[in-house]
Amino acid sequence: MAESSEPPVVLLHRPPSLTFMDEILTREFRTLITDTSSSESLPSFFPRHASSARAFVISGRLPVTDELLSHLPSLQILVCTSVGIDHIDLAACKRRGIVITNAGNAFSDDVADCAVGLLISVLRRIPAADRYVRSGNWAKFGDFQLGSKVSGKRVGIVGLGSIGSFVAKRLESFGCVISYNSRSQKQSSPYRYYSDILSLAENNDVLVLCCSLTDETHHIVNREVMELLGKDGVVINVGRGKLIDEKEMVKCLVDGVIGGAGLDVFENEPAVPQELFGLDNVVLSPHFAVATPGSLDNVAQIALANLKAFFSNRPLLSPVQLD
């Protein structure tokens, strides 16, 4: 790639609160910053200010459509600060010759920690017990109902990638028996492999969802899966909300078809089914599994490394395969 006397123009789009990329990019590039609170629409802003932008850094879940890309004629690389890329029209990027990078393993430790935290919270009923004490009910009514032990649980992991592997290692420390379902069997994995999620659910007490959202994994956890998991079964989701048929999950939780759920992601964020709010066997968090200062610093460094590599014609650190 030809050298230029001026730094390349990089476009950064982010929510107003996520400023962690601003300084690191402006030190290296001519950076244009837009945020989700702007009164000017992106199709209006781009032609007037960003037509020369060669890189587009997205912090958040902006839908990247073919129509949006049409307003960025100079764009060559799309840098996502998320691992999931289901908000991007991959076919349009491929057709336009735009390469894509994602966050790689920047969030894996923190998401795995959150998954384990949700599982412990659901099984031991920690948030419900906290509310019981704060409300004064302990003094009024005595002991709180018992939770379930974590140790020894059979845990099925859906998606044994980086995050799924980290979840497995953490839960091994609790004496949990790990098995998994993934696109293909991992020859180096010591865990039992199930080729379909129905068998995984039938032979486990817990399902932890760590996989990407694709056409194949959309609603991978449906009513049949939850019925096989059983009345004491628990679902933990730190992947994507649409991995679960949310309406059926709500019915299963209310009717006692499954025993509980720990959810960091939802089908129509930030909307959450109100039926979940009154259930003590459900623990909710606002899609924050990835969000710690350490992980945000990690992803900023990965994004910067990808940009530097691209503009120096070196291999990318975390490329997304479009084939």
From Swiss-Prot:
Transmembrane segments: none annotated. Keywords: Glycolate pathway, NAD, NADP, Oxidoreductase, Photorespiration, Pyruvate. The active site is at 240, 269, 287 (proton donor). InterPro entries: D-isomer_2-hydroxyacid_DH, D-isomer_2_OHA_DH_cat_dom, D-isomer_DH_NAD-bd, NAD(P)-bd_dom_sf. NADP(+) binds at residues 160-163, 182-184, 238-240, 287-289. Disruption phenotype: Disrupted photorespiratory flux leading to a slight altered leaf concentrations of the photorespiratory intermediates hydroxypyruvate (HP), glycerate, and glycine. Inhibited by oxalate. It catalyses: glycolate + NADP(+) = glyoxylate + NADPH + H(+); (R)-glycerate + NADP(+) = 3-hydroxypyruvate + NADPH + H(+). Its EC number is 1.1.1.79, 1.1.1.81. It comes from the Eukaryota. Pfam families: 2-Hacid_dh, 2-Hacid_dh_C. GO terms for biological process: oxidative photosynthetic carbon pathway; photorespiration. GO terms for molecular function: glyoxylate reductase (NADPH) activity; hydroxypyruvate reductase (NADPH) activity; hydroxypyruvate reductase [NAD(P)H] activity; NAD binding. Catalyzes the NADPH-dependent reduction of glyoxylate and hydroxypyruvate (HP) into glycolate and glycerate. Mostly active in the presence of NADPH and glyoxylate. Belongs to the D-isomer specific 2-hydroxyacid dehydrogenase family. GyaR subfamily. Homodimer. This is Glyoxylate/hydroxypyruvate reductase HPR3. It comes from Arabidopsis thaliana.
